[in-house]
Amino acid sequence: MKKIILTLVAIATILGLSAQTTEAEKSLTTQSKDTLDGWKTGGIVSLNLTQVGLTNWQSGGENSLSVNGLLSLFANLKKGNSTWDNSLDLGYGILQQGDDEVRKTDDKIDFTSKYGQKAFKNWYYAGLVNFKSQMTPGYDYPNDSTRNRLSDFLAPGYLLGAIGLDYKPHEVFNLFISPITTKMTIVNDQTLADAGAFGVDPAEYDDALILVSSGKKIRVEYGGYLRALLKKDIMKNINLQSKLELFSNYEDASHVDVNWEVLIAMKVNKYISATVSTQLIYDHDIDILDSDGRVGPRTQFKEVIGVGVSYKF
């Protein structure tokens, strides 16, 4: 029920904000559709730094240094009745606290390429390819002297291909719907694959605990896919980007994978800005160990707040 409510809230939020497009925006968008063909490129890069230094501090605490970087790029082509949209989002963050080793706080690779051919009015026949992964290994730290590797580049990696309809009423909002989607989960690490991480088939052992077959490194699913994207200046110097992705495996349509990302960029001047980013994930095939020892699918949530240097181009 929580999952359904979160999904409905996400869709309502995106559609509601999209409906608030002003007449000026509509006029500008209409003009660009009629007159502008060719490439449109741009992006944003930001670097946030937080540092705490303590000397003889009676209240206690630890020195710390945190760095978070974000790069978001797009390159879109419009030519006649054809469109080709490409986007790349990269994020990385590290934390050094006290005498602990450097730990990762953020790591993201997200690439999407979508080609469309106009069908009627604001609808396009379209094909989409999406790739998600991370750059470096990820760990958890059960105690000060132990760390367990949980992930790595292509462990997991997600490759999704979809064919469907793309709704593009204006540049602010975009909705892609596909009844024909292939989702491939890649776990290119045998230890993680043997453990059945990220939903792949785990290794099999006989009664003497001798390995019979190794865990599968690839899992393929077929289902339906929805992707809603909103990019809007909600106030002067405040930009909102929201992306909602839903995938339902036809073999078990009652469980919907959810990926909802939000980025709010608040500009102070040409270079200084504050950013707030959140990501909510639910995947029924991923089991997560709770602090109380229970294992099962859980709603994952991440938020990153930072103030630093940014540049929009």
Question: How would you describe each model-predicted region?
Answer:
Residues 47-53, 79-81, 90-96, 131-137, ...:
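Transmembrane beta-strands of outer-membrane beta-barrel pores
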Residues 15-44:
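Sec-dependent signal peptide cleavage junction
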Residues 43, 47-49, 69-77, 111-117, ...:
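Residues on the lipid-exposed face of transmembrane beta-strands in outer-membrane beta-barrel proteins
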Residues 54-59, 98-102, 138-145, 187-194, ...:
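Outer-membrane beta-barrel translocator domains and adjoining extracellular loop/strand segments
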Residues 299-313:
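Outer-membrane beta-barrel "beta-signal"
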Residues 55-61, 96-101, 145-151, 208-216, ...:
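Extracellular loop and loop/strand-boundary signature of outer-membrane beta-barrel proteins
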Residues 82-84, 122-125, 172-175, 237-240, ...:
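Repeated loop/turn-to-beta-strand initiation elements of outer-membrane beta-barrel proteins
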Residues 104-223:
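Outer-membrane pore/translocation modules
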